[in-house]
C-alpha cells in the first residue's frame, strides 16, 4: 500500500499541549512529496491561516466536513445544516446556559464553550425528538448535522483531487477524527487521542500531540505507506 496524500487534524494533533503549533511537524510537512490536507472542526478562516503559515496546500476540510476549500483563493463548498443547528441551539438555550464561539465565522454548525455537560445536551435533544449530533472534541462542543463529518469531507476532497479516500493517510486525536480514519487508507492516532479515535486507528503513536504526528509520519515512511 502506497498512500498519495495525508489528511490531518490540527488541535491536539499537530499542536503542543498549549495549542501552539509544533514547528518540527510543520517543517516535516514541507519536506514531504505528498499533499498535506488540514482537517479540523475550526472555521475556514482559521484553517486557511494555519495552512498558509505552515506552507502547505490551501485544500482544507473545515467545520468537521461542513466546509471544503480547494485553495486559498477558490470558492468554498458549504454543506447545508446551519439552520437545523440554530434551531437545536435555540431549544437547548431554554434549558441550559450556553455560550457560542466564533459564530460569525461558522457556516454549517454551532459551536459552544465547554462549560456544560454534553450528555445533558444530548438528553435534552432526545427528549424533544431532535435528530442532531453533539460532539465534544476536547476543545469545544459542536452542534452539527448528522449528515456531515470529517469522513464525508474526505470523500469530497478525494473526489476533487482525483483520488480515492483510501489513498490518504489520516492522523488525528479526537472523536471527530474517527470517521476520517475509517474511510482513509490508513489511520493513525496520536498517543493523547480519545477512545473513539483510538478504536478507529490502525496504529497508535508512543508520542503525544505534535511529536506524535511527527512519529506517525516517520512510521508511515519507514513502513512504505508513503
From Swiss-Prot:
One MF annotation (Gene Ontology) recorded for this entry: phosphoglycolate phosphatase activity
Binding site for Mg(2+): 9, 11, 173, 177
Catalytic activity reported: 2-phosphoglycolate + H2O = glycolate + phosphate
Keywords: Carbohydrate metabolism, Hydrolase, Magnesium, Metal-binding
Cellular component per GO, a single term: cytosol
Active site: 9 (nucleophile)
UniProt key word Transmembrane: no
E.C. code: 3.1.3.18
PANTHER family linked to this entry: HAD SUPERFAMILY HYDROLASE-LIKE, TYPE 3, PHOSPHOSERINE PHOSPHATASE
NCBIfam families per record: Pglycolate_arch, PRK01158.1, SPP-subfamily
Function of the protein: Catalyzes the dephosphorylation of 2-phosphoglycolate.
Protein name according to UniProt: Phosphoglycolate phosphatase
Source lineage: Archaea, Methanobacteriati, Methanobacteriota, Stenosarchaea group, Methanomicrobia
